[in-house]
Every structure is written in structure tokens, then in C-alpha cells.
Amino acid sequence: MNSIDAVVRYSPLRNNLCNLPSAITTMLFSADFNIQQIIVELSWVPHQRAAQRRIAYCGWAGGITKTSSSNPVIEIDRSLASAIDLQENVNVTVNVHIDAVKAITVELEPVTSNDWEIVETHAQVLETYLLNQTRCVYPNQVLVVYPTPQTTARLLVKKIEPEVSTFAQLFNDTEVQIAPKVQKRPSISSVRSDSSGHRIRRVRSSTSTATGRRSVTNNGEVLPSMLRRSITLPNNTYAHVNDSKSGGYKVYCNLNELIPALQNAHFVSVSVLVGPGTPDRTGLTSSKIKQLNDSIDQAAQTQTNAAGSSHPPESSYTETGKVIAELVHDSKSPKGNVGLSELLACSLGIENTVGNLISLEQARKPLIKNPLDTLLTQLMQLLSPLLDSCTFTNCVKLPKIGTLLPNGGLLQFKRIKSGWTTPLGKDNVSLEIGEEILRPESFIPSYDLLPDRKTHVRTQSDQYPTAQENLIESLSKIASGGSLLFGTSGSGKSLVISQVAQIVTNKGHFVKLLNCDKIMSESYNNLRGIFEDIFSEVSWKAPSLLILEDLDSLIPAEQEHSDSSQSRQLSEYFISKLSALSINRDITILASSKSKESLNSLIFTTHLIEHDFQLRAPDKEARKQILQSYLDTLNVFCSEGELLNNIAVETEGYLPKDLKVLCDRAYHDLISRDILADSDSELDIEESSTPILNGSVGDIANKQSEIENGISGLELTNNSSSTIAVDKHGATIQKDNFDSALSGYIPQSLRGVKLQKSDVRWDDIGGLRDAKSILLETLEWPTKYAPIFSSCPLRLRSGILLYGYPGCGKTLLASAVAAQCGLNFISIKGPEILNKYIGASEQSVRELFERAQAAKPCILFFDEFDSIAPKRGHDSTGVTDRVVNQMLTQMDGAEGLDGVYVLAATSRPDLIDSALLRPGRLDKSVICDMPDFDDRLDILQSVTRNMNVSKSVNLSSVAGECSGFSGADLQALAYNAYLKAVHEKLTKDESMAMAGEMDDNDDKKRMVECFQFSGNTEKKSLIELKPSDRATVIKKLEHLYQGNGNHAEGETKSKLATTAANSVIITSKDFEDSLSETKQSISQSEKRKLEAIYQQFISGRDGNMPDGTASNEIGARSTLM
């Protein structure tokens, strides 16, 4: 292909490829060549005097350049151009090669040891993306690789197999070998035994490497320096170092890692490099802050522009004030880190921090103060030539004179108060050296002004997350990939995170904690700016741990009918930035949220979050430890040894925050009772002092002053609860205090959860002895005998099916067992969870079990279970089929039902899907059978317990006449008998009122006549009042007639009379009348049908799965497909 001439332009391609002008690309596209096959040859003359042209080879990136004026343009990366010494705007000749020799083996060698460190760190990245960056190699080529967007490394091509004279093409099977190149570092003993001449020669050679830096003094002296990451003491990483505030200024580091010049130094000059997150108090004046920020930006821009050059420029970072410190060898110091003594860290303004970059520079030679006489003699000798050549006046400025006057000075003549002055010769002139003028104030604080260690050391929090040691240990391990800590509000996430941050900091890692709740209202652009600063800081101080607390408030899950654009934008931004940071630097992410579902799902699509930990509600032993921890903080002791154990049992489902509030309420109750007791004792003293008034006036005055002093002391005590706490040192808390605290308190997990409370007591249910016994074994025993069941290796049953005849007490039994066992109760009806839309019913079931899990220990009761979970395959809409599938998933144990018991009630167990009746789901089936004679008698006694039944009533005979009655029928029988007695009572009261037998307070009889009138002229039939209504009206008139005389006494007598008059007594006749009107709710035919179904359910099930064939029986349901 014909060659063309083009002009070189730099472009940030970040590879060893180039973009070609359209004159070439048009022919390549028309010829249908593969981009990977094209090799571009560039030849140019380096400068006008050069006699030989230079040649380089590269691949084609597939891009097309824009032609400027009439000259074609070729674009190339700046780093690649610097490696092949190709300047911008140079004319080059471009040739395109199609057929090239394929390289089998390529041997490379890093140009410097720093290049080898970069290659070794990012070996996996280079192995993956090397072919995307390079298409060909040629002998003695300086190959530039780009492991990260910010770094480059240069490799020299040493050998190519097969040997070629021009170039060879790389392909997938090419083996690339990179030889290591490690910098040799001499030992400490050999360095410190060298002479000063050897030392200077090594320093000058080391300053040309990238590991060292150079600092030039005003006198032109070159001082070597290095950059290191700092860890301020005290820190567990340097726990073996005995450091104190009086220990002086010291730097602890491994001298083997330093450059030779610093290895031999006993003192170094320490300064802080200003970077992202550097404290503002690091020895800087306020006027320099803007200049430092500008210098950082300029340094970053210069480094970007000069990346990949053959001689990289020196760093232009800005340093703060310098402090001379002693260099101490510490072989246990982490690699790349140095420890700063507490005094040195406070002087630099970075106390109690980790990760700041500091510069270690060889200290200058100290100025030796000469004797005054010698100094004056030398100064006079140097000033003699100036005295001959010029005349000095008062306050003339003197020039800089070596080490005598390094900053120059002012000449001042002494004044003579009186007398005549005569000129003197030079030999008679006397000199004196005064004080320094404009001495700069040191930024190092005075020793006495330095804060104590206790203000800087991160002491362990008083509220340590009890019973979470394993979780904290897992979170504290810095590993690849992020972690998510989720739990409900009040579960202790913030406390665990603060403890993890403290542990990680003590390991020498930088920790950045951000509470996302505080910035959730910011706009997207502002949030990007905030996180750009945070990412820069954690990258600058790496290795780092970035903690994002309450991340779900910033990037919540996308809702169906809400605008989630900002959440999606932030999620994509986090994924791109944090993924790049995690790969390039040692940065780990720890986020917290209320649940995994509350976060945007995009976060979990990548490996940004690889580990998740859930904070569950503490178990009984953990609750006991938490209660003990809070009581120890309050300095309160328990009155009984088993008190905390009993309280832990009663607080099932309480979160750590709830337990803290409970302890505070109990402590407040204790203090309140003490205050009331003290108040009562003071009042008793005051009352006992009343007889003193009969004495003399002096005695009365003295006693009055004593009472006033006692009252004032009482008021001082009541004004401060802390004073009472001191007086009650080691106070003992009682069970009554906890009972008062528990009374009326709703745990945070139960707030907003709809719980049903039933007034039915366990004694109110008659009969059902077997069913009640099985329920107590399942629900009450695991809590009552927890130590025995905890050692049981078997899985406890958590599901019970109550089936039986209608009206036999299934629902009543389920509502009463919750109160009997102290469990929460959630009742569900079918229409509450059934929804025709796909996914809505499943979501309702999931939310239902989540509610039960939050309210555990809890009973989840499904009434009429056959309507919610019928056999699958017979529903044309598929709603109940999906509900059954979801319930199988929730009850199977995969989701976990710890503390949640499922009760289901039905009268048709044959209609329930058989998969729900297998072990592990509804483990036990309990029948609620028709009551026999003993059960009927027990039911009647339970129902009539709160009724006034005449002693003449024989409940046994009534129970004998109720054969075939269910429990609901017997209850209806008793209620009907009570209504009969009420009607008789009302009729009797009406007749007494009409006959005038009810007397007033004066025992005068009155006649009450009831009549109706209407103002309407139209004739209408009057409505006659019922006897009950007439009696009510008469009673109201009676109360109005009584008036106000003797109100209190009359009211008391009226109440007693009313109670006696309103008592309703049920007689045998009432039961006989009720029995004649009450019929059985279950017919004999229905009873026989249900009995056959229950018998088949108990003993006739074969366990076979349905084969999917529709039933041909009459009345069977089928699905139209």
C-alpha cells in the first residue's frame, strides 16, 4: 500500500495504537481487512541535523482522525510518543502492513525497578488487557503498558521468537515473559560504616530514582528525602513501642526500607504532604491554604501530562512546616509505613490520624554557636573592607555574611546621653550583637499546651456491642470485596460499625465514615462533588476502609410508581468509581442498611458487595448479657439471681435499643420511688413537729428553721437525678421496677405491626383437652423449658393444623393460646392476601411472614385455610397456586421460622394441598371433635362462669339434653337463656313502675303516666312504646326528679339499689325455653359426611402425588385450559 505523509498529534488513547487519517482508512475499510491484522509503520527524522530516519511500529486503534488544512493527521498517545522520542507536530511517513510474522515468545524487561513494582502489582490486569493495548513488538522497543488509568510502566523488548529484523505481531497464543528487576538495598551496618564520600556518592545516585526525592537548601545543598505513609501513636500496630508525651520527637520505621542516605541518618526533617483530607492545623497559615490547593492541582496536572516520559519529572507536592525528629529503627513497622510519636504528631497537627503522607528528609547540619568573642572578631574582619569603602549611618542594612549573619541585619549606633563625641579609628570600634529582628513564630505548640493523651486516644466506647464479637471480627478483616451490614432500626448497626472502625484504625488502616442520612437531601451534582472528595481522600490514604452508613437512604430500591432516576444514577456512579478504586488501590467498602431489599438492586449486580451480614434480634443469652451490661453502666445491681434471666424470657423479640430503653425506664422507676419515699419521710418529720407550737417562741423559731433547712435540702436532692444516683451508690433494682418499665412499652420491632389481642382466656375454653395439651407442648414448653429444648438435637415443630367440625372452638382455641403462652398473635383471613395480579399475592405472603418475624415470638393464624391454600391445579386464575408455592417456600425452613409458629384452622382438611401437610411445614394435625358429655358440661360451666345462674339449675341435666351440640351451639344456648332472663327482668320492672311501687328519696309514691302528642294536624297512628323502652324512660325521669339534695349519699344508695335491681338470674325455666328454641347447627347428614372425611384424612391417605389427570367424579372441580 502506498505511503503518505502526516502530522503527529497527541491524543489520550492509553495504548500502543494510533488513529489514521481518512485517506488510509477508506482503503482499509473497502478492502475489508480486520483491524487486528493492520500494523502501522512510522518513519521520521528526529531533527534537521539527523542523517538517519527513525522507524517505529504500532497497531491501528480503528479510529479516524480529522484532517487539519491540507495535511493528514495521525493521533498517538503522549506516553507512547515519549517512549519512541516522537515529538508533536513532526511530519512522519505512514506505511501500512497487512501480513506480519506471529510472535511465539516475547521476553520483556522493566526499564526501572519501579516499573517492575507496577507490573508485579497489576499482573492480572496486564495479562487480561495486554492484547487490547499492543498489537506488535520489535527489537529494542520501549513498550508502554497501562495497568490503570493513572499509572504507566515501561518494558524493554529483549528477545522475540522467532527472530525478526522488523516486527512481529502478537496474538492469543503468544507467550509473554517479564524478567524481574528489583532494586538492591544495602544493609544498615554496611551503610553506617561507609565514609562520608561514599555516602554522598550514593545519595546522588539515589536521587535519580523514583523512590527518593530531593530537597535543595538555600545554599544549594541537596538533601535526599522519601515519602512514607504515617500512623500516629498510640496505635496497636506499634503496641510494642513505649511512647509517651515526654518521649520526644521520634519516627519509628524499618531502616532497611529507606534509601541509603536516610539509613545512615540519626535525625530527619519531617513534614506533612498536603493532600485530600489533610487537617487544616498541619503547621500552615491561613494565607497558604489556597496556594496549597492550587499547587496540588498543578502537580496532578503536571504528572498527568508527563506520564510515560523517559525522565519523569520530580514531584511538586507542597509540604507543611518541618520538624526535626529522631529516626528510630523498628523492624516490626509495616511495610511502607512509619510511626510518629505522640509529641511529633501533635506538633505536625495530625494527631490521632492514620494514612497521611509525610516526607522524611535528611536533617541539615546543625548550626554550632561560636563563642561571642570569636564571633565578634570574625564579624569585624569581614566588615573592615566595607568600612574603608563606604560610610555607615544609623540603621543601615547589612548584607548576608555566611553563617554569622545568614539573613543580614541592621547596624545601630549607641546614643550618648551627654558629652562630646570624637571620631575613633577602626581599631577602637566595638561591636555588639543584639536580638533577632522579626523572629518567625514556631507553629509547634508549647510542651505545656499539648493536650493529654486521653483527649487523643480513641478509648473504647462505653456502649460496647455485647454478644457480637464474631460479627465484629468478621467485619474487621480487610479483604477484597465490599461488605453489607443490615438489620432493622435499633439492632445496633451504628454501634457495631463504630467498633469495627476503631479496630481497623488500630490495625493501621485509614477509616472514612460517612452518614448518608445527613446528605440525602442534596442534589445529584452536589453528591458527586462530595463523593469525589471522599474517594480522593481514601485513595490518598490507602489502605483504607470506606464506611457508608445508612446507604439505603441515599440509593433506595426503585419503586414502581415513584421517580427513581437519582437512585439509579448514584448507583451507577458508585459502581464505576468504587470498582475502579477497589481494583487499583487497597480500599474496602462497608455499607449498612435496614435490609438487602431496601438497597438499589444495581449494587448487587457487580462484585462491589460480596459479603453480607445480618443483625438479628438477640437470643435469650444475648439479651441477658446486654441487660447486664446496661445495668453495670448505671451502677445498679439485681435483687435476685434469676431476675435478669426472667426478664430476658419476657423480652423475646426485643432489640438492643429496646433493652437500653427498658433499663432506663426501670432505673427511672427506681429513682422515682426513692424520691417519693424521701418526700414522705420529710413530710412525716414536718407533721411530727406540729406539737412544738405549744412551746416557747424561741423553740418555735428554732424548729421552723430546722424544717426549712430540711425542705431546702430535699429540694436540692430532687433537682438532680445524678445526686440521687451518687447517694444510691450500688442501688438494687427490683422485679417491680422492671414490671413498671414493661407496662405499656411497645418494642420498636412491633410498632406499626397490626397485632390482634383477644380477651379470651385459657380457662374460658371448655373441653378440647387433647388439643389444648398438644398446643401447650408445642408453643409453651420450648419457652418454659428452654435449657432442655436447646440441648435437643431434633428440629422442633412449628406448624399445627386444627381441623374439626364447624363451631367446635378452632378459632377460639388459637386466639386463647397466644395469651396463655405469652406470644404475639396475627390472624389472617383469605381475602387479605389473595390478589388477581401476578406477584401481588406472593408479595403479601412474604410481607406477612416478615411481620411475624419482626413480632416474634408470634403465632401466625390462618383461618379457613382451605380457601387460602387449596390443592394446586384446579384454579383457573392460578392465584391460589402461586400462594401455595410461596407458602411452601416460607414454611419449608429455607427462609427460617425461628420464633414464628403457624396455626391453620379448617373444617375441610381434604381440600388443602398435600404438600403443606408434610413434616417440616404443618407438622401436627389436631382434631377438634364434637364434645361428649364431659366436654359439654365443661363448656357450659365455662360459658356461664360470669353469669348469675340460679342454684336450682342443674347444668349436668342440661348437658345431657344437648347431645349432638357443638361448642358454638352450647354457647348460643347459654346466651339465649340469659336473654330470656333479661326479658323477664325488664317485664317485671315495667310492671312495678306502672303499679307505682318505686319510691323516691322521701318515700313518697309517684305515678308516672306516659303519653304522646304531636303538633302536626294530620292524623297519624301513634307508636306504642315497648316495655323495655318505657322502663328506660322511667329511670331517667327518676334521676332527674331526685334533684341535688343529699347528692353524695343519694348517689351511693342509688348505685347499690341499681346493682341489686339490675341483677339478672337465670333459672331452669330459661334454660328449658332456650333449649326448645336452639337447634343443632350441624345436621346428622353433614356430620356423617364430615366424619367420613376426617376418618379418611387420618388413616386413608396414601401419600401419592396427584398425576395431573382431571377427576371424572360428579361435582369435582376442573380447570378449563
UniProtKB/Swiss-Prot annotation:
Bias (Low complexity): 205-217
Subcellular location: Membrane
Domain of life: Eukaryota
CDD domains named in the record: RecA-like_PEX1_r2 (cd19526)
GO cellular component: cytosol; peroxisomal membrane
InterPro entries with a match to the protein in the record: AAA+_ATPase, AAA_ATPase_domain, AAA_lid_3, Asp_de-COase-like_dom_sf, ATPase_AAA_core, ATPase_AAA_CS, CDC48_domain_2-like_sf, P-loop_NTPase
Disordered: region residues: 187-221, 1099-1121
Keywords: ATP-binding, Hydrolase, Membrane, Nucleotide-binding, Peroxisome biogenesis, Protein transport, Transport
EC number assigned by the record: 3.6.4.-
Chief localization: membrane
Root EC class: hydrolase
Molecular function per GO: ATP binding; ATP hydrolysis activity
Catalytic activity: ATP + H2O = ADP + phosphate + H(+)
Topology versus the membrane: Peripheral membrane protein
PROSITE patterns the record matches: AAA (PS00674)
GO process terms (BP): protein import into peroxisome matrix
Function: Component of the PEX1-PEX6 AAA ATPase complex involved in peroxisome biosynthesis. The complex acts as a protein dislocase complex that mediates the ATP-dependent extraction of the PEX5 receptor from peroxisomal membranes, an essential step for PEX5 recycling. Specifically recognizes PEX5 monoubiquitinated at 'Cys-6', and pulls it out of the peroxisome lumen through the PEX2-PEX10-PEX12 retrotranslocation channel. Extraction by the PEX1-PEX6 AAA ATPase complex is accompanied by unfolding of the TPR repeats and release of bound cargo from PEX5.
Homology family: Belongs to the AAA ATPase family.
Quaternary structure annotation from Swiss-Prot or TrEMBL: Interacts with PEX6; forming the PEX1-PEX6 AAA ATPase complex, which is composed of a heterohexamer formed by a trimer of PEX1-PEX6 dimers.
Protein name: Peroxisomal ATPase PEX1
Organism: Komagataella phaffii (strain GS115 / ATCC 20864)
Source organism phylogeny: Eukaryota, Fungi, Dikarya, Ascomycota, Saccharomycotina
